[in-house]
């Protein structure tokens, strides 16, 4: 297990109250030994003007997952800050929900790199994102 901080899904979701994460309807759904998952609805909150999932909403889901996963790998007195994010969009989604799966590519003392893959309800890859973070403290 890679996690140094232990939080329940209920506690993870409580951190979203009053934030963009809550506004977008993102909910943490699974904390595995080396992965963090969350879902996000595809609706008017996350659509672009043409009725499809907004790429920025996908990036927000990815950064939410990578940042929280990074935080969970730090010790007391440490935190992580995002330094770079990229997202490749593979497939349009117009309704339902998407699921993001976040796993580490690199966990160093001063930097981390996370891969976040976003799937539609049929399990098809919609977006591949990479988030780099700096470990502070």
UniProtKB/Swiss-Prot annotation:
Keyword Hydrolase tagged:
yes
Known HAMAP family for this protein?
Thioesterase_EntH (MF_00907)
Q: Which domain of life is it from?
A: Bacteria
Q: Which family does it belong to?
A: Belongs to the thioesterase PaaI family.
Q: Which InterPro entries match?
A: HotDog_dom_sf (IPR029069), PAAI_dom (IPR003736), Thioesterase_EntH (IPR026576), Thioestr_dom (IPR006683)
Q: What is its EC number?
A: 3.1.2.-
Per the record's keyword annotation, is Transferase included, yes or no?
no
The scientific name of the source species is Cronobacter turicensis (strain DSM 18703 / CCUG 55852 / LMG 23827 / z3032)
Query: In the UniProt entry, which residues are flagged as the active site?
Result: 63
Q: Subcellular location, in the record's words?
A: Cytoplasm
Picking any one GO molecular function of the record gives:
1,4-dihydroxy-2-naphthoyl-CoA thioesterase activity
A GO cellular component annotated for this chain's UniProt record is: cytosol
Q: What is its main location?
A: cytoplasm
Q: Output the SUPFAM superfamilies linked to this UniProt entry.
A: Thioesterase/thiol ester dehydrase-isomerase
Protein name as it appears in the record? Proofreading thioesterase EntH
Lineage summary? Bacteria, Pseudomonadati, Pseudomonadota, Gammaproteobacteria, Enterobacterales
**According to its UniProt entry, what is the function of this protein?**
Required for optimal enterobactin synthesis. Acts as a proofreading enzyme that prevents EntB misacylation by hydrolyzing the thioester bound existing between EntB and wrongly charged molecules.
Please cite one Gene Ontology biological process associated with this protein: enterobactin biosynthetic process
How is the subunit organization of this protein annotated in UniProt? Homotetramer. Dimer of dimers. Interacts specifically with the aryl carrier protein (ArCP) domain of EntB.
Pathway(s) it belongs to: Siderophore biosynthesis; enterobactin biosynthesis
Query: Gene encoding this polypeptide?
Result: entH
**Which key words tag this protein in UniProt?**
Cytoplasm, Hydrolase
């Amino acid at each position: 297990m890679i996690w140094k901080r232990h939080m329940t899904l209920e506690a993870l979701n409580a951190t979203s109250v009053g934030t963009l994460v809550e506004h977008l309807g993102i909910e943490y759904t699974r904390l595995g030994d080396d992965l963090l998952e969350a879902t996000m609805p595809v609706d008017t909150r996350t659509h672009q003007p043409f009725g499809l999932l907004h790429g920025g909403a996908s990036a927000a889901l990815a950064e939410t997952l990578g940042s929280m996963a990074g935080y969970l790998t730090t010790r007391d007195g440490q935190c992580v800050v995002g330094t770079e994010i990229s997202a490749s969009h593979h497939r349009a989604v117009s309704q339902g929900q998407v699921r993001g799966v976040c796993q580490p590519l690199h966990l160093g003392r001063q930097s981390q790199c996370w891969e976040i893959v976003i799937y539609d309800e049929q399990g098809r890859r919609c977006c591949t994102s990479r988030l780099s973070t700096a470990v502070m403290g």
